Amino acid sequence: MLFEDRQKNRSTGPTLIGFNQTQNEHENTVCPTHPESSDRILKIKEALTKTKILEKCTVLTNFLEIDDADLEVTHDKSMVKDLMESEKKTQEDINSQCEKYDSVFMTENSMKVAKDGVACVRDLTNRIMANEASNGFAVVRPPGHHADSVSPCGFCLFNNVAQAAEEAFFSGAERILIVDLDVHHGHGTQRIFYDDKRVLYFSIHRHEHGLFWPHLPESDFDHIGSGKGLGYNANLALNETGCTDSDYLSIIFHVLLPLATQFDPHFVIISAGFDALLGDPLGGMCLTPDGYSHILYHLKSLAQGRMLVVLEGGYNHQISAVAVQRCVRVLLGYAPFSIELNEAPKESTVDSCVSLVSVLRHHWNCFDYFPSRTSLRLAQWPIVNTKVIYNYDPTTRRADTGEIIQDELASTEFTASDVIPTENMETLIYFNEGDDAHFDLEEDNHPEKPARTRRILKTLRESGVLEKCVDRNCERIATNEEIRLVHTKKMLEHLRTTETMKDEELMEEAEKEFNSIYLTRDTLKVARKAVGAVLQSVDEIFEKDAGQRNALVIVRPPGHHASASKSSGFCIFNNVAVAAKYAQRRHKAKRVLILDWDVHHGNGTQEIFYEDSNVMYMSIHRHDKGNFYPIGEPKDYSDVGEGAGEGMSVNVPFSGVQMGDNEYQMAFQRVIMPIAYQFNPDLVLISAGFDAAVDDPLGEYKVTPETFALMTYQLSSLAGGRIITVLEGGYNLTSISNSAQAVCEVLQNRSMLRRLREEKEQFATKPQKIESSCIKTIREVCAVQQKYWSILKGFQVTPSNYGLDIDDEAYDDDSIDMADQSSSSGSSSSSTRPSHNLEIMDSGPAHAVVPLATCPHLKEVKPLPPAKINARTACSECQIGAEVWTCLTCYKYNCGRFVNEHAMMHHLSSSHPMALSMADLSVWCYPCDSYVHNPALIGAKSAAHESKFGETMPS
């Protein structure tokens, strides 16, 4: 079957666990207590067995043998030959051979062990790519990510993940994402794929400006690939120890997920080093085992869940085993355990993030959220310094790892909650077959009609999704006491009077007393049953351990416009609000998150909890500057709650153009998920209106079923997987049923099996476009919400950060589609920059632009060419004459960042550091991220001045 067909027919399968059985034959004979030992694997096996996870997996130990030709796909023939010769040597000679390498040990059997490890990862990859399995974990050693094409290094002999990538290519994958979580940079993997755009390599590692092993300049953020692979290498280099779950998840949401989503891989490989764990003797970081599992969970949303996790480092054997256990749980479909993010990401982490973004944003427009780093009127990052600093002295003797006594390290114990339940996970579907008794007496084709729920159920049944779930025609009728958890006695009594009215009276009552409501004599009963179904789902979700059950409640009438005292907007009772209060009262849920993605703001829900510190209401909705229903309600980004509830209302109010998948996904990555993680709910309720879907007649947005599914998947990472999705609006029967099916599939599969976009829409042929008004809105939301949620701090860019008076239009447009505006801008852009520089310089010393007097890159300035400098020439790439710069190494002319950014692209591809502006004769150093003025530059400046003005430059 072709890979394209396997993509269309993706389904769930087993999780594979692979062990190389011979791994205990590879030990350090010089240092018996060396941390990279067979005990690592034994502890992992014990953990997986003790918690009964291994029983849920398909365990593989025998693999098709590989030969030297397989190894030579990623390693030079001479390297393979040298290593293979160890099989014929004495241990003494082997030890002498190892001294040629950095931190390598071997025995006469090490080649057999290493080849078994490679065979394991290749076998698992082949099975996953063939749809024989959902995902897999290769529990193998020795690790591999430090081994490059010419040499073993850092405990690594052959590069396992590189071998897995080649197997995936052979099996049909065209794009592979490798995420390296080891605390040490996987420079071997980076080198192998550095000029290969088929592989996006993303590493999060400790660097400390080169002080941490492997002490390489290439481990820093400015190394982003070369040749065709330019922009496909990403180093998130951490320059401080003690980074926590907050730091790592900030990286995931702000940098990795946006980038990986745009890359859209066919296969994901995790270089799973567990030495960033709190308690690791070598790492110095504070990531928790559950933090690891959350990272894995979100990466599993890519590539239709095709993921291979490959063991790398991790030298506290017991804690590493716990982390592996947590990760395999996630691979099996269980939601990760909840984590608390009580602190802001470190300033140095934010610095590392935006430094990386600064060099990648020219290649990936998913980073349009961030303004151009070297544009002075947009350079408002409060704590960022993107200078490349390299502190390591290569003459310093590298300390040996030495022995590590495992019994002296920190440890943790498994609890009963770690043991996998014997029963399978369930998805519960609730509906009310009698909801057709609530209909519009006057208008047969009212958008909120009984056909909505019937069509959804029909689609679920015909697609085969319903039979995989536990479906319930729920007859539970919510009691007065339950309804009054939210609604007033007066409101309930008023609705009870409608049960005896005649049709004419009902129509008159609806028009006179309500806003956008119709009534029948059975409306109250149907509405009670809608509430009852949601409450029943709460009870059954809390009957089991977190994550064992989730639910989709397909009921009407909807609820999120109903306030405590008034039915409104097709809504009688606020189903979700009653459920939130009920969960708190009955099941002691301390914190409840309500996420409302209905295109209309859930004004009723927000009002009910506006002063409540224990219920968070988050809404992504169409706002149109207040002119979209519900008009006149507090639903802007500045409406954040009051009193004890201040900061507990989060509104993402889109205005202007039609929003779609990219905008909703950005809102989730930048706003929803970071805040929701820090809130850390015990229950997640989704007000699932599907009127933002493609072709909805009221919403007029263009969100696809796949994005509704993705949002559901991401929210399922919270509350241990206790999530209930409740139908709200949605008025195109095809759109609503397709969207509900996609959501139900995610709930049932616990995985994203759908592709996020069609092949013809891939980034390579159609770069994703983020609407500028969306970016403006999200910036505004974050600027307000960072006051309440520390996980957002440092990432927000607003004029107020520096007190600069910048108009919104200029602020937005310069960070998005700069190439589009430049072609018609003439020379205006070249004059804007110097004048604005002067304005900033005049504003006082706090904002003065002071060029560096010297920099280490002046040595790269070459003598003038025979033709000297032509200040009136155009860009050599696009032939546009606006804002032209000349490289001071090769004297090539290229346009600046307000045109098509060819000067920056030239720097990134050639590493030529300095350029001279033909507009204002300033010199910019890219690596130093600063202007430079030095006598060594006078010759070039004088030549440009003479060409530009026809006279000698004044001294």
UniProtKB/Swiss-Prot annotation:
Segment Histone deacetylase 2: which positions?
425-749
Query: Which SUPFAM superfamilies does this entry report, sorted A to Z?
Result: Arginase/deacetylase (SSF52768), RING/U-box (SSF57850)
At the top level, the lineage of the source is Eukaryota
* Cofactor(s) annotated in UniProt: Zn(2+)
Q: Name one GO cellular component term.
A: histone deacetylase complex
Q: Where is this region: Disordered?
A: 815-840
Instruction: Report residue spans for region: Histone deacetylase 1.
Output: 15-337
Zinc fingers (UBP-type), as residue ranges, are: 853-951
Query: Which GO MF terms does the UniProt record name?
Result: histone deacetylase activity; histone deacetylase activity, hydrolytic mechanism; protein lysine deacetylase activity; zinc ion binding
| Alphabetical list of InterPro entries matching this protein | HDAC_PDAC, His_deacetylse, His_deacetylse_dom, His_deacetylse_dom_sf, Ureohydrolase_dom_sf, Znf_RING/FYVE/PHD, Znf_UBP
Q: Which reaction does it catalyse?
A: N(6)-acetyl-L-lysyl-[histone] + H2O = L-lysyl-[histone] + acetate
Q: How is the cofactor bound?
A: Binds 3 Zn(2+) ions per subunit.
Alphabetical list of PROSITE patterns matching this protein: ZF_UBP
Region annotation (Ubiquitin binding) maps to 896-898, 924-931
Q: Transmembrane stretches, by residue range? A: none
Task: Locate the residues binding Zn(2+) 1.
Answer: C855, H857, C925, C928
Could you tell me which Gene3D superfamilies the record lists for this protein? Answer: Histone deacetylase domain, Zinc/RING finger domain, C3HC4 (zinc finger)
Q: Which Pfam families match?
A: Hist_deacetyl (PF00850), zf-UBP (PF02148)
Q: Where is the composition biased (Low complexity)?
A: 818-831
Which residues are listed for Zn(2+) 2 binding in this entry? C875, C878, C895, H902
Q: Sorted alphabetically, which PANTHER family does this protein's record hold?
A: HISTONE DEACETYLASE 6, HISTONE DEACETYLASE HDAC1-RELATED
Q: Which family does it belong to?
A: Belongs to the histone deacetylase family. HD type 2 subfamily.
Q: What does this protein do?
A: Probable histone deacetylase. Histone deacetylases are responsible for the deacetylation of lysine residues on the N-terminal part of the core histones (H2A, H2B, H3 and H4). Histone deacetylation gives a tag for epigenetic repression and plays an important role in transcriptional regulation, cell cycle progression and developmental events. Histone deacetylases act via the formation of large multiprotein complexes.
User: What is the protein name stated in its UniProt record?
Assistant: Histone deacetylase 6
In which organism is this protein found?
A: Caenorhabditis elegans
Q: Which gene encodes it?
A: hda-6
